[in-house]
Structure formats: C-alpha cells, structure tokens
Curated annotation (Swiss-Prot):
The active site is at residues 168, 194, 290. GO terms for molecular function: phosphorelay response regulator activity; protein-glutamate methylesterase activity; protein-glutamine glutaminase activity. Residues 156-348 form the CheB-type methylesterase domain. HAMAP family: CheB_chemtxs (MF_00099). It comes from Chromohalobacter salexigens (strain ATCC BAA-138 / DSM 3043 / CIP 106854 / NCIMB 13768 / 1H11). Phosphorylated by CheA. Phosphorylation of the N-terminal regulatory domain activates the methylesterase activity. GO terms for biological process: chemotaxis. This is Protein-glutamate methylesterase/protein-glutamine glutaminase. InterPro entries: CheB-like, CheB_C, CheY-like_superfamily, Sig_transdc_resp-reg_Me-estase, Sig_transdc_resp-reg_receiver. The keyword Hydrolase applies. The gene is cheB. It comes from the Bacteria.
Amino acid sequence: MTSNKIKVLCVDDSALIRDLMSKIIDSQPDMEVVATAPDPLVARDLIKRTNPDVLTLDVEMPRMDGLDFLERLMRLRPMPVLMVSSLTQKGSEITLRALELGAVDFVAKPEMGIREGMLEYTEMIADMIRAAARSRPRAVAKQPPAKDKAPLKAPLLSSEKVIIIGASTGGTEAIRHVLEPLPANSPAVLITQHMPGGFTKSFAERLDKLCRISVKEAVDGERVLPGHAYIAPGDWHMKLARSGANYVIRLDDAPPVNRHRPSVDVLFHSAAQSAGRNAIGVILTGMGRDGAAGLLEMRQAGSYTLAQDEESCVVFGMPREAIVAGAAIDTIALSEIPAALMKRAEASGRAQRV
C-alpha cells in the first residue's frame, strides 16, 4: 500500500525529543514518522531502509557529530534536512554551519518546559516539514572566500541609497551569497531574516567575517551608514526611519505580523515610507507570504524591486507570492542579484531626497 504522506525520519539522542517530534508529525494528516534513531549511525541504515522525504537531525549528538553526518549526507545523498538546535551560543553557531552545509531550516528547542514548548511549535514544525519536502536540497560546493575574489565595482551614489532584503527558509545562505560580493562602500543594507532570538547575533558575526562590508545585529536608534549591513534581531521588528537628513533604525516588539517577528512586511513598509525611490527591495527564498504586500508598497512608492527566481530558491514561497501580487519588477537568479543591485544603484544616479 502506497502513501502520499511526507515520510519523516527523526534523529535525536533525546528520547523525549524523538517522542515529541513523533507526536507532532503524526498529528498531521499529510505526514508520518517512518522511523526514529538515537544517533547518526543508526540513522544511516534507516535512511536506506525507509527512504524518508525529510530528515530531522539534532545538532549535537554522541557517536557521530551531527555536522559530520550532515556533510557526508549532503555529499552522498542530498535530501531535505531540518535541524533541531539548542538556544545556546554554541548551538546557534553549529546551526548556522549546518545551514551552510545544506540543511533547509532549523527548530530551536525551548530552554525551559521542553514538552509544552515543543507542542506549542506544532504548527510551525509541520509547516517547516512541508516546506522542506518541497525544497531543493543540493550538495554545497566548496567556494573560495569572497575576499579572495575581485569585488563588484562600487556605484557612484549618495548615502541616500539603501538596499532592503527579506528572507525566510533557505535565507541564511542566500543572504551570504548576496552580501559577499558587495564592495566595502556599497549602499547600506537592512535585512530581515526569520530567525529566533539568540541566532541573529551569531548570524551577523559569521557574515561579518566573510564580507567586505561590515555586518552587525541592528541596534535601536543607530544611524544607517553605507558599507554596513544590519540584521534584524530575533523577536524584534526592524524599521527604517528618518532622523533629519539621516536614516536610522527603529526596533519594536509589537505583535507578530504574518506570524513572524521580525516581519519582512514591517521592514518593507517602513522602507516604502522612509526611502521611496531611494530604496531597492529584494525578496529571497522562504515559505509563506511575508513580504509580498510590503514589496508591493515599495514598488508603488517608486522603489526598484526584485524577487529571487524559482530555480535558485530553496523554497519558492515568499518570492512567488510577491510575483503574483505584482510586487517584483524583475525576477532573477540568486547568483545575479549582487551585480543587479550595484548596477541598479548606479543607474538611478544620485539619489533623490524624499
């Protein structure tokens, strides 16, 4: 008897997490746990026997490190992997490395009340598994650091220009691919990536080591400067605002928008109001529709807007919604976005004050 359900294999050294993930997944009508494993060595045999559609993998495990296993898996049998991580500094750094190696997304285990907390995540975990099952897993080719490559030519423009980016599932690597080639005097970049608190600081620090521009977690009230990228902190909405002739960052903990905080729509809406035609809006890979309405507002305010194309997306959800809404002027491959941003910034000439 064949089943159209998404087949999931859960790998975790915690019996509690294996049990909770099984309960969450088996409660959904369109997915099922076909097996569980306490470590990667057991999982290796179960993958051959059960041929799962999605693997959930604990970041830190005995017998074989989760990262070592993931690296081998993505090299030999690329498949959608959802990481399960702890909310620690070490856990966040390992998780970011896992995303770099090809994991689709991650779930952060609650620090307290794991059983209740995980069950509260039921809808989110189910959505992540559905997105993972539809994703395009790919082995990650080794690339030289961006600083070893020639940078893109910096555009001639005023400090009024600003690049606004929104992303979700698959976004951490997509953002890296966009930022790495940018020259040190690139226009300022503001980024909202769906990510819980505790991970965005590690994400910013990781990017800062790889990029020519400075990358940091955003701070409320700070001035937005060329040559800098600002990542919205987890659990905080980020907005672009005006203070006299300058752009500044505003953070707030208003309720989630589209079930997310930070929300891409919140950032895009603020950019439409504060920067208008001086802004460039970019929507990258991700599930759901967050950002579609805001990108349309940016386009209507005179901003140049673009969406990542389906072929280069891990999950073609947010870009598709933006395209359907008529929000994206152009749709291009991820590899072409950095050059398109610099070309567009220069083509627009000296920025006009709003």
